[in-house]
Amino acid sequence: MTTKEFAKILQDKLTSEYGVDLSVASKQQIYRSLALICRQMMSENHKKFQSKAIGTGTKQVYYLCMEFLMGRSLKVSLFNLGLEDVAQKVLADADINIEGIFEEEPDAGLGNGGLGRLAACYLDGMATTGICGTGYSILYEYGIFKQKIVDGWQQERADNWLPGGQVWLKSHPDQAIEVRFDGEIRENWDHGFHYIQHTNYNSVMAVPSDMYVQGYDGKGVAKLRLWQAKAPDFDMSSFSLGNYNTAMSKNASAELISKVLYPNDNHIEGKILRLRQQYFLSAASIGDIVQNHLSTYGTLENLADKVAIQLNDTHPTLAIPEMMRILLDECGFDWDKAFEICQKVFAYTNHTVMAEALEKWNVDIFKMTLPRIYQIVVEMNRRAREELEKAFPGDEGKINYMALIGDNQVRMANICAYTANSINGVSKLHSEIIKESVFHDYYLFKPQAFKNVTNGIAYRRWLLASNPELCKLLDETIGEEYKHDASNLSKLNKYADDKTVLKRINEIKLNNKKNFAAYLEKSTGQVIDPNSIFDCQVKRMHEYKRQHLNALNIAAQYLYLKENPNADFIPKTYIFGAKAAPGYYMAKQMIRMICKLGDLINNDPAVRDKLRVVYLEEYCVSLSEHLMPAAEVSEQISLAGTEASGTGNMKFMLNGAITLGTLDGANVEIADAAGKENELIFGMLTPEVNNLKQVGYHPSAFIMGDDVANAALNFLERGWNGEDFHEVTENLRTSDPYMVMADFKDYRRAQADLQRLYADREKWAQMSLKNTANSGIFS
């Protein structure tokens, strides 16, 4: 498209929507107009793409996930449509900076962490490779929450993203689906047919809104269908009788389902709301999938041949019994045929190696909230136990562990494991661990179902759209084929000894650091030194991710620099970004400790030129796009055997950051790909962790005799300015569930190696090059 053509399209949209000329339009008006242009183009492309797929009988892939961490859409949509350069030129001609327009868009409040980002990347990947993919989730009105740090404490505020983000959504109230909760079930048999009557239920309407993800170079378009909860109709009779609260409460109760992502479940009301959310997503999505299939083929007999449904984690597990309900109650299939269809259609991705994190629901809550689904799960469980008895005769312990219901709980992961045709982990290590521990019995029962699908990233977003200077170097050295196939990045390996290229890599990284420092100062007022090492740990705040290990080392470095002010120490900026779950007290204490430690260090003139700590409030995808090109060290320091995979580690690697990490999750594959000599590996291996657990782990054994560990713990315990962090340190001294103290000494060794290697600028650039060159396997 020419500049002139695009300028006319933009002006026409500004005129029709706002009645203004480009020269006087506000940034918000320009953003919305560009978004509408992209949405219209992608909608038309999607219609053509789907029409062709239906005509050839192509299989449809449906991806159900509780969250999709989409970030901003304008920049990536223009980029994938091939319109970013022309849009930039049109705006520049009007003396408008396109980056300022991008900043008008809020991050979509549809996700939280790696689970949601993986889901978003899969949509991008399906669209780019021409797979007919549709994602399903909930249209959260307020997202998870907007993070505000006040005096070191995380505060949660409503993330009112829809006013700015709704422009990407097209609502389809005519395609709404009824979802039923509560009530009683009556069963009747008539001439051999089984009839179900659901009475006294509460209805909620699932109203769909669609947004689109354009594949790179226009190969395909994926759709993300988001469900908004609405009351079926206003209770006029109650209102007319003066029962205003009753009339309004029905609306409020229904719409609560799509208010926020992951409501606090530290109380019974929160648990019920989460269960309702999960069934709402599952029932609406399965109803939509069945309707789509029937409208195309007129029968469900071929559903398994034409449909694949991927369950991303256990949140959408109820899609399985809901599909059974539709096939049994509405379509007249017998049990065996219905379950055979489910087995062929559903696949399951597991995201945790910790058995305690696998979702389970109290039977009483489940039965009350979803009476018909409970009946189906009970029958599934009965049949499963019969089948398992044949496979493991007399092994009651194994059968009880594998059962779908047990200990007064409905076990989501076991429903998936029993039904799904494919059960995958998200890294090689994780996939082995689930076969050996969490799902070992199911692996013995159906070994052919278990496989590994290592996580990946939408690399064009994190490289092409985020790091143009590095892309320019890649274009000049290896050509542009990598833009279409990431495996071509490996061609960069032949420049590992090219001093000119290595010098350019260091220059590009420094320039990206300057850009990030300027962005940070402008947006937050925080000042950092671009010549310092940028050491980054940005991920969900959780004990198993061990941000407190990082903080403990920072405290140790602070004490060292106070005692040795003239020490040879390359200046370092530690960058954190993370949200803690609202009800997770220890994670919030960790945030407070990091923020207060940062305040102390950043305001101490004796050390602040050598050591700084930055906490990125409200860390999100768009902020990540600024940070990734500037990062030099990627902290991936979870206890070996606890992190399933990770995707942030891959984005850092792609942009040339060196992984400082344990051999956990996808770190193993990163080290294998780039070479362990090009990463900073520390800590126990998974078998060592397991052995230590078996013999009994006592953190005191690792603290005793370690003067540095003792000094750092004592320092944090005593605190400063009337604040202390004894709850964190007491946890580390006594229980330390994620073995921070066991790995602390080796972590310090890795940090010392980092300082030594970074001093050799050519060697560091070579390590950086090796990471970028070998990151293509994660695309």
Can you describe what each PLM-predicted range is?
Residues M1-S779:
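A conserved ligand/cofactor-binding region detector
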